[in-house]
UniProtKB/Swiss-Prot annotation:
Organism per entry: Vibrio cholerae serotype O1 (strain ATCC 39541 / Classical Ogawa 395 / O395)
Name of the featured protein: 3-hydroxydecanoyl-[acyl-carrier-protein] dehydratase
Active site residues per record: H71
BP GO annotations: unsaturated fatty acid biosynthetic process
Catalytic reactions of this protein: a (3R)-hydroxyacyl-[ACP] = a (2E)-enoyl-[ACP] + H2O; (3R)-hydroxydecanoyl-[ACP] = (2E)-decenoyl-[ACP] + H2O; (2E)-decenoyl-[ACP] = (3Z)-decenoyl-[ACP]
Lineage of the organism: Bacteria, Pseudomonadati, Pseudomonadota, Gammaproteobacteria, Vibrionales
Family recorded in the similarity comment: Belongs to the thioester dehydratase family. FabA subfamily.
């Protein structure tokens, strides 16, 4: 694997979406508009709540982001499912970062709680992912807990985010 670092900028994340960051066969992030972060500010295999890995990432909020026009006209708010998807994206990125190969797929989440919202007046969303378990055998899978903060205030909590990497997704 190439380009294993402890942080990544927007250009790096765009390279990942094209399969050019870690190399052939490693999981890719989605391309814009579904790429839900602008930078990853910290990657660690040993830190975090469970000592199994920590990911911190950020999304800059501007009123012209695509989802504010359609969700909802006259009452713009970032869809909660996009924050959830961002957490799955980051778990998949972590799996590639630790050497896992395959195509990333979200497998589920145990529990999600929304206690706030992301409005066009916000400045920054922060994602915090605490890895609980990584399986890197024939099956590559990550299990994590995550939090979404807007301008420093926690607004979503997800428990047991699951992502798998698959060599063949035709039967998925």
């Amino acid at each position: 694997m190439q380009n294993k670092r402890d942080s990544y900028n927007r250009e790096d994340l765009l390279a990942s979406s094209q399969g050019e960051l870690f190399g052939e066969g490693y999981p890719q992030l989605p391309a814009p508009n579904m790429l839900m972060m602008d930078r990853i500010t910290k990657m660690s295999e040993t830190e975090g709540e469970f000592g199994k890995g920590l990911i911190l990432a950020e999304l800059d909020i501007t009123p012209d982001l695509w989802f504010f026009d359609c969700h909802f006209p006259g009452d713009p708010v970032m869809p909660g499912c996009l924050g959830l998807d961002a957490m799955w994206q980051l778990v998949g990125f972590f799996l590639g970062w630790v050497g896992g190969k395959g195509k990333g797929r979200a497998l589920g989440v145990g529990e999600v709680k929304f206690t706030g919202q992301i409005l066009p007046t916000a400045k920054k969303v922060t994602y915090e992912i605490n890895m609980k378990r990584v399986v890197n055998r024939k099956l590559v899978m990550g299990l994590a807990d995550g939090r979404v903060l807007v301008d420093g205030k926690e607004i979503y909590v997800a428990k047991d985010l699951k992502v798998g990497l698959f060599q063949d997704t035709s039967a998925f």
